[in-house]
Amino acid sequence: MKNNYKIPWHIRQYVKRELMDYKDNKKLVEKYKSNIAAYKGDTRALLLVLARLKYIETVLDSLNKEDREAAEIIFIDQYTQSGAEIAKGLSKKAFYNAMNKVIYLVAREMDLL
């Protein structure tokens, strides 16, 4: 059975970028939390990043083990499809199915759909 994870292109690109930036944003938030008194930036921007991280973490926590591992390979380790196939043994079908599923679920969690 084919899963239907179709979403508008612009939403897909936005969510995919957020997922690709997840690791860097997580490090940034940890840096700010460790030295919150010295933070002199835009607190609204920090709150928005925290909200986006929460949406992504909620979706990642809801995934089964196989999809979670695939999502980490794709979005956190940032392997290409061929790189994931060679290094991690992730098939092309599993790669794209996991990527589309995670993007769709994060978009729904962010109320973009």
Give a label for each model feature.
Residues 1-62, 110-113:
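N-terminal interaction/assembly modules
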Residues 70-71:
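A short pre-motif secondary-structure segment
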Residues 77-94:
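Helix-turn-helix DNA-binding module
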Residues 89-112:
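DNA-recognition helix of helix-turn-helix
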